[in-house]
């Protein structure tokens, strides 16, 4: 059969070779893919009615897209994220401007300002991922997390960047319009920096190439997403997702970036030692507030990639007091969770203040920030959670400082015999 004689779908242009079924009508054809698409549209809530009485599909107005003020956004983040005041304020403004821009576009207003993508710097366990997760929860938008170290450029073994968009689409239950205003958080972004500032002669599969691959979807493009994931191949069906209004937040520890900044500023002018050895954490946090795009380029990020992020902010290492606050203050604080778990067994779990600080000190020594807190508490309470459901005599458990620092057994308070009966 000649190519010009191939029967094609009148709606999408796919040939009979590219589809499973092609249904004929009077001088028109429709493929199975377009039928599924139309079915999805008909399943949605009723739309406007034309003068002839027929129901017509109109552009979505997204009445549920509420734009909170920066203060409202920060207030909500404060319920879950301890510390990082500067980062929370900066991100609140960026997110406000981002969704204000989307609302203006949906209302067919001319918008001259670009996307407010965010780059978060900071050590492991400082709250970067939690801030992104909390934003998605506040705004009630789809959210997904990707690990930059698993991504490769097209043609290499690994994960295509389009699969990140697929995961967002899955989080939106394949509602394309909803996914198109979601949030994607890419962790470990510093790991795809070039090892040197000089352009590599050989291909850098997991570094510069990935940055190049991410450029378009971060800036805004129509991505052809394979609905089942994996590598693309000819004749495969794709779901088209416009990434123009997806908010991208990327984060990384950027180890030694502080030294690059110090070198640019001139170490003798900012009060640091003459050798560019290890700074104190306070010095590092201060230096990272001075970060410029040229520092990130010197670190190994390509200029085009850095240019996609007009909001760059540092998350500081958490202090001892902040780690204690994380244990007890947020709405979903981990100590509150364990207290609730034990109360389900009619047992009162008590943490002395000194014990909380001992846990925080132990977490700080682990060098993984708030992430270590959960592991420490799990190891501490695991045996108790095993025994308590089978022991009705236990009324309360008191966790003291020596329980943490010297591995002494917690104080167990038992009920009077008559209370058990």
Swiss-Prot record:
Zn(2+) binds at residues 9, 12, 31, 34. InterPro entries: AAA+_ATPase, ATP-dep_Clp_protease_ClpX, ATPase_AAA_core, Clp_ATPase_C, Clp_protease_ATP-bd_su_ClpX, ClpX_bact, P-loop_NTPase, Znf_CppX_C4. The keyword Nucleotide-binding applies. It comes from the Bacteria. GO terms for cellular component: HslUV protease complex. ATP binds at residues 123-130. Disulfide bonds: none annotated. One of its GO terms (biological process) is proteolysis involved in protein catabolic process. One of its GO terms (molecular function) is zinc ion binding. Keywords: ATP-binding, Chaperone, Metal-binding, Nucleotide-binding, Zinc. Gene3D superfamilies: 1.10.8.60, ClpX chaperone, C4-type zinc finger domain, P-loop containing nucleotide triphosphate hydrolases. Component of the ClpX-ClpP complex. Forms a hexameric ring that, in the presence of ATP, binds to fourteen ClpP subunits assembled into a disk-like structure with a central cavity, resembling the structure of eukaryotic proteasomes. Belongs to the ClpX chaperone family. ATP-dependent specificity component of the Clp protease. It directs the protease to specific substrates. Can perform chaperone functions in the absence of ClpP. PANTHER family: ATP-DEPENDENT CLP PROTEASE ATP-BINDING SUBUNIT CLPX-LIKE, MITOCHONDRIAL (PTHR48102:SF7), ATP-DEPENDENT CLP PROTEASE ATP-BINDING SUBUNIT CLPX-LIKE, MITOCHONDRIAL-RELATED (PTHR48102). This is ATP-dependent Clp protease ATP-binding subunit ClpX. It comes from Chlamydia abortus (strain DSM 27085 / S26/3). The gene is clpX.
